[in-house]
């Protein structure tokens, strides 16, 4: 009898370019043998990463210009992600980037919530960081320096440093042979 794998939901705004988008896809590829991995994205416009063989769900709520439209988008994304979480019942939801982190912490349906702080640009809004930390089980940092600053400057204690080893970083993003 096959053992049931834990369910992992990765949340990202888009997969068009950038560092955390690449980390999201690499994380899915690395963990897919041990977890039932699904990537949820807010828009499938201009996908730049190879997602063949991965379970990907487009929530189809792309970015909008203007404050009112952005606020409406937060509500739409929250509703859609909450529905997806209820359907998939993830054991862990890990989000990449401030936009995805916000929606992740606003949808506490089931399982653990992890939010990712990947750069100093993410640290520009202390009140948002405190919200992420308060509503996250773990705040995942890509460096010891960022984790230290979150603890020292903002009193955020639930941090972990997680990074891909050089072996994983140097691997190509094309799908592995079946």
Which stretches of residues belong to each language-model region?
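N-terminal strand-loop element at the rim of the active site
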Residues: 5, 10-18, 22-71
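Short beta-strand scaffold positions
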Residues: 41-42, 94-95, 141-142
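Short, charged/polar "capping" segments at the starts of alpha-helices
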Residues: 45-50, 123-124, 148-149
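A conserved, positively charged/aromatic
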Residues: 68, 85, 112-144, 154
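Short His-centered aromatic/hydrophobic patch
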Residues: 74-77, 94-101, 117
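Glycine-rich phosphate-binding loop signature in dinucleotide/nucleotide-binding domains
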Residues: 84-91
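Carbohydrate-associated surface elements
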Residues: 145, 165
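Single conserved hydrophobic/aromatic residue that forms the stacking wall/gate
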Residues: 167-178
């Amino acid at each position: 009898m096959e053992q049931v794998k834990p369910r992992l939901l990765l949340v990202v705004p888009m997969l068009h370019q950038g560092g955390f988008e690449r980390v999201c896809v690499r994380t899915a590829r690395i963990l897919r043998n041990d977890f039932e991995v699904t990537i949820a994205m807010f828009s499938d416009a201009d996908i730049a990463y190879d997602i063949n063989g991965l379970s990907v769900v487009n929530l189809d709520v792309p970015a909008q210009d203007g404050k009112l439209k952005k606020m409406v988008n937060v509500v739409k994304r929250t509703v859609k992600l909450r529905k997806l979480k209820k359907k998939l019942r993830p054991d862990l939801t890990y989000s990449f980037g401030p936009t995805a982190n916000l929606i992740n912490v606003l949808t506490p349906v089931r399982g653990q919530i992890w939010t990712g702080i990947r750069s100093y640009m993410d640290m520009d809004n202390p009140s948002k960081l405190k919200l992420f930390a308060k509503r996250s089980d773990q705040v995942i940092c890509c460096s010891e320096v960022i984790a230290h600053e979150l603890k020292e400057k903002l009193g955020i204690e639930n941090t972990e440093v997680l990074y891909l080893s050089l072996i994983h970083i140097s691997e190509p993003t094309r799908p592995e042979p079946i």
